[in-house]
Amino acid sequence: IKDEDLLRLIDMECFCWSVMPADRTPMINAGMVFSDRHAGGINYPKGGVGVIAEKLVAGLEANGGEIRYKHRVTNVLIEQGQAVGVRLADGEELRAKRIVSNATRWDTFAGEGSAQSTLVGPEHTPAAETTWRKRYQPSSSFLSLHLGVDASVVPKGFHCHHLLLEDWAEMEAEQGVVFVSMPSLLDPSLAPAGRHILHTFTQSDMRHWKGLSPSAYAEKKQHDADRLIDRLEALLPGLKSAIEFKEIGTPRTHRRFLGRMGGSYGPVPANRLPGLLPMPFNRTGLKNLYCVGDSCFPGQGLNAVAFSGYACSHRIGADLGLNPWSLPA
């Protein structure tokens, strides 16, 4: 491919999935992007994306499982070199035959670049985690806005999704690409009559939000949100005056409420890697402890993370002798 505009478009499409340009996005992930967005089209769950989580919960509970909300795990319990359970913030201990961490590897294992408090201490962190840290680094987080707007500002024929970038050279820059989604265009039940929901976000690194006093943080939060809204006026003239509800999320918001180091979207290669092969599968070097999510094969993105969960369930089933076949270790 020689056409510069087409190459930039491919970079942008890959960036939407992996927050990396095409030359650092594994082919399998890039294939999912173009298949989903151009060949098969996209789908929204009726009732909002939260319906996916609700259905998963219903399935787990129907099979005898239990979910405890607002119960923070502080440690993985390790005895005789193997994981045997978890300790909660209130001191309660829960034990099981197999333990699964859906936290990032920086939040799960101690080591260089890890979160201040990890689930597994340095004395039990496998050596392979040091190698992983040399290959991957955390991507940036996001500045996100959830807006409730008067429907009169939305022109007829407005699309559900938009990407806004004024300068191709700024694609990977702080607050470069603006992602816009208006799901109430497809599912009017998501918003009151005469209103629309607008979700917009742009990449933002934690280093720009550190060391701020409460007043300075509030000021930057509002300033950056206003600047983002100003940019959106190119798509929706009059947007600012049509906003009736506004909720702002920053990298600090994502760190606090999602439990992710630096609010990171996930791992990206520190250097160019040979595809997905260096990305570990679900087993870890600590017996009976598994990892799942974007720190495992096949990486970032909803489809990829869902696959890692599917793979992990089969891996554990095989290790427990519950299914006759398994995916790679």
What is the meaning of each model-derived region?
Residues 1-53:
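Conserved redox-cofactor binding core of oxidoreductases
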Residues 7-18, 175, 179, 238-298:
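A glycine-rich dinucleotide-binding beta-alpha-beta segment and adjacent secondary-structure elements
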Residues 66, 70, 238-247, 323-327:
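Flexible, glycine/charged-enriched surface loops at secondary-structure junctions
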Residues 74-192:
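Mid-domain catalytic core of redox enzymes
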Residues 78, 317-329:
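Active-site-proximal substrate-binding core of FAD-dependent oxidoreductases
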Residues 294-317:
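A conserved FAD-binding loop/helix module that cradles the flavin
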